[in-house]
Amino acid sequence: MTTMAAAGLTDAEVAQRIAEGKTNDVPTRAARTVSEIVRANVFTRINAILGVLFVIVLSTGSVINGAFGLLIIANSAIGIIQEIRAKQTLDKLAIVGQAKPTVRRQSGTRAVLPSEVVLDDIIELGPGDQIVVDGEVVEETNLEVDESLLTGEADPIAKDAGDPVMSGSFVVAGSGAYRATKVGREAYAAKLAEEASKFTLVKSELRNGINKILQFITYLLVPAGLLTIYTQLFTTDAGWREAVLRMVGALVPMVPEGLVLMTSIAFAVGVVRLGRRQCLVNELPAIEGLARVDVVCADKTGTLTENGMRVSDLKSLTEGHVADVLAQLASDDARPNASMAAIAEAYQTPPGWSATATAPFKSATKWSGTSYGEHGNWVIGAPDVLLDPASPVAEEAERIGAQGLRVLLLGSSDRSVDAPDAPGVVTPAALVVLEQRIRPDAGDTLDYFASQHVSVKVISGDNAVSVGAVAGKLGLHGETMDARRLPEQPEKLAETLEECTTFGRVRPDQKRAMVHALQSRGHTVAMTGDGVNDVLALKDSDIGVAMGSGSSASRAVAQIVLLDNKFATLPYVVGEGRRVIGNIERVSNLFLTKTVYSVLLAILVGIGGLSAKIFGTDPLLFPFQPIHVTIAAWFTIGIPAFILSLAPNNERAKTGFVRRVMTAALPSGLVVGTATFVSYLVAYQGREATPVEQTQASTAALITLLASSLWVLAVVARPYQWWRVLLVACSMLAYVLIFSIPLAQELFMLDPTNMKVTSVALGIGLAGAALIEVLWWVQGRVLGEERRVWR
């Protein structure tokens, strides 16, 4: 149908609407600004703790003892760089949001930015044009609109004059114009985007667990700090500078500062690896989140199926050149729809006939055709329209269609296709059976999730039969339900979701309700989607996964964006998440062992200092300065932890992170702390000690600490592979070199020259290592865990 051209607004009318604020001001999408990203990564609990201690150390003038302050920069930089990179990528992807509509005004027809559209503007449409605001069609020529990003319905919808069009949809055929009736925040797509516009952080057990540990340590630092300050300043004869440095030396190792850094590095490396697979991660912990998911809600269109269809069968009903006819019809269609494009792909050798008349496809008539003179008049379309619905051929087509397939009838007509009463009498020639093009990797992806005990729910706006057919072909078995029959009550909805696998005719609000219902049953839910209709469900799910070709709103709220639109990338994301979770849990034992022995040492030294004040015994200096605890962490924790955090690890993700790591770290830390304190007491010469003797006592304590801590590393590195053994051996060798090189001894304030003291310290350290080994085997037996030394 063709309608008359509508006049556009005058310049005065446009100016008036701008003055009244009736413009298309699109809501800010759900993403943090650069300043918000910087604030979130700089002003953290651990940076605050380290920052205060760093300033205290600098006040003493000892720069070398402030080396731990570099961690403040590293902790912040990794998170900032990654999030800003993700933000920049998303901004570049927002092409749809920058589509330039063509408006018709008194001053002429011109392309403008979406934000420059005003209420009542006449906006022209052509194939592929984005509809940027809600409106009403005022003129059309065979206009068809794809609203799949809004409704999930894959089939294009014919639009006549007076019909509404919604922002977020686009033109697939024909041309026309519409009048803007709702702009800015009143538009449909903008309302969904605004409802989802508040930024929310992804849930992370690792992040939450580490924050709980840091919170506890923060509370612990106050009494421990006061005790250490008092004993070092008021019970010893050391000057304020020496006392302050040893106080900081007691407090710094209590903070598992490297754990936050190592977690960020492990996540960042995972992000880089996934980036090579065209997977954009908006937030670092999203990798962990997907590894913990036990239900994936997958949108059928664009996730399990590709855009387009394929010919799955051709049922010839008469003798003749059916393939030639199909090839010629497809070749002559200048703007083929999905069905004709599939036929063109299947039949690529047209006979070269000349067309004498054509009839384009219209949704209202549901057929198209071409007349070829002596070669006949050929039509193709819906069987129940071209034939009597009660005819055997139409009934056969209906039976095939009930399997979720699309069926077209190819037939010859007794009159030209441009005749007023066309198509006339149609003689059936063939049934063309089409099916949605299934992604070649979708089946393997679903098999992977099944093997990992992850349930997959297929959700779509298409009819339930079609959705169920696609799921069945992919080996996803289970009951199919039409979402129009879903119960409204959350409890009953949750029960239905547990029983059924595929859902058709799902509304956008139902997708969100389905996510909530699954979460109410304790499930960790991932949601995949690409349209505006998926935005709220993506936002409320535990992990939102958007397609790169989808709407800008869906990409903004999702934690993970698949830039190449491949559902098959998700198993790699799960694998990276498992690597991060398993390895961070492993290296957490190293960092928290240090926290435990540091707290124990501070308490024991504090008690010793109070005893000196009460009973008049020799005062007790804290054994270490900040540089000592810094080098102690280099090769017992820092570098080995970094290497271990990047190692392959495909263990299933489990909950209870804090409980498990503390169960391992607490006994090890107590052993290391006790052994170090005993070694220090043996070597300590009391009030009369010379500076050299005090340095030798500190060195002895450090040797004991290193010997026992290195065995903690040896235990954490199990089960051994050749490179893990080499890692532990190199760590041991590094400390041998540090203690052997005179320049290093002077720089790090070490003196191992008293062989008697050094030998005793080493012996105590080896005894601590032996006890740690025994505890590891005992813990395995008590917890019922298999202990393996070698892989």
Curated annotation (Swiss-Prot):
P-type ATPase involved in specific uptake of calcium. Essential for growth and maintenance of cell surface integrity under Ca(2+)-deficient conditions. Mg(2+) binds at D299, T301, D530. The active site is at D299. Coiled coil: none annotated. It catalyses: Ca(2+)(in) + ATP + H2O = Ca(2+)(out) + ADP + phosphate + H(+). The lineage of its organism: Bacteria, Bacillati, Actinomycetota, Actinomycetes, Mycobacteriales. This is Calcium-transporting ATPase CtpE. Its EC number is 7.2.2.10. The chain crosses the membrane at residues 53-73, 213-233, 252-272, 596-616, 627-647, 664-684, 697-717, 725-745, 757-777. Belongs to the cation transport ATPase (P-type) (TC 3.A.3) family. GO terms for cellular component: plasma membrane. It is a multi-pass membrane protein. It comes from the Bacteria. It comes from Mycolicibacterium smegmatis (strain ATCC 700084 / mc(2)155). Disruption phenotype: Disruption of the gene leads to impaired growth under Ca(2+)-deficient conditions. Mutant also shows hypersensitivity to polymyxin B, increased biofilm formation and higher cell aggregation, indicating cell envelope defects. Keywords: ATP-binding, Calcium, Calcium transport, Cell membrane, Ion transport, Magnesium, Membrane, Metal-binding, Nucleotide-binding, Phosphoprotein, Translocase, Transmembrane, Transmembrane helix, Transport. GO terms for molecular function: ATP binding; ATP hydrolysis activity; metal ion binding; P-type calcium transporter activity. The keyword Cell membrane applies. Its main location: membrane. Induction: Expression is negatively regulated by Ca(2+).
